[in-house]
Amino acid sequence: MKQKVVSIGDINVANDLPFVLFGGMNVLESRDLAMRICEHYVTVTQKLGIPYVFKASFDKANRSSIHSYRGPGLEEGMKIFQELKQTFGVKIITDVHEPSQAQPVADVVDVIQLPAFLARQTDLVEAMAKTGAVINVKKPQFVSPGQMGNIVDKFKEGGNEKVILCDRGANFGYDNLVVDMLGFSIMKKVSGNSPVIFDVTHALQCRDPFGAASGGRRAQVAELARAGMAVGLAGLFIEAHPDPEHAKCDGPSALPLAKLEPFLRQMKAIDDLVKGFEELDTSK
């Protein structure tokens, strides 16, 4: 079955092409740390031959606590992104939270991301669609895979069909997430075979029901990522940090930066194997 290709500059993203890595850090903690992390990703992905898009947030507008670190903000964040692009020649993905942010952010980065908690906000979707940028839509934890076609349709009505879908798990009772591996193929089907990627970092989140910060299951990142890659996906979304225990956001779910290369070697091996299989139709 023909898969839709979404191009991010010279990077082609599709379910039947070699996977693209969307990776970086959760939130911009400082200019120097962003440079350090981006440089490591670029070095490793170039060594392994993996297409790469750098990810970071300039503002975490949905933190659980009012006291949690949010990021440097729009103006300073765009300056850091511009320096990363000029220094390393990378493509960049970041999220927006308000309609007014869509165009200023799209003027700097290559992919703008619709956060899971905001994925049904029509005003935000319309503003993002109007930019003409490539869009990454995070599937809300409370939305079934089959409902994602409605969000894609909103973007199409807004004149933008350059949409990537991203799964980051589904609510499983209170304060826990699980990933339905059958959901990936459903998302492909309802979106006209749009590229589907897997955010393994945020799928590992779990919470202290009375705490102010998210916990995580970093020790299981490789096994969950291997399971997702075995489905046959357009890309993998992963956040890493040189010192996860002291990261300012989602450290418990972050991959230790030093483990990036061996982790990606495993992901590439699985992706190469799965996409070397002949398509098998078991529906009839």
UniProtKB/Swiss-Prot annotation:
It is found in: Cytoplasm. Its EC number is 2.5.1.55. It catalyses: D-arabinose 5-phosphate + phosphoenolpyruvate + H2O = 3-deoxy-alpha-D-manno-2-octulosonate-8-phosphate + phosphate. Keywords: Cytoplasm, Lipopolysaccharide biosynthesis, Transferase. Pfam families: DAHP_synth_1. Pathway: Carbohydrate biosynthesis; 3-deoxy-D-manno-octulosonate biosynthesis; 3-deoxy-D-manno-octulosonate from D-ribulose 5-phosphate: step 2/3; Bacterial outer membrane biogenesis; lipopolysaccharide biosynthesis. It comes from the Bacteria. One of its GO terms (molecular function) is 3-deoxy-8-phosphooctulonate synthase activity. The keyword Phosphoprotein does not apply. GO terms for cellular component: cytoplasm. GO terms for biological process: keto-3-deoxy-D-manno-octulosonic acid biosynthetic process. Belongs to the KdsA family. This is 2-dehydro-3-deoxyphosphooctonate aldolase. It comes from Escherichia coli O157:H7. The gene is kdsA.
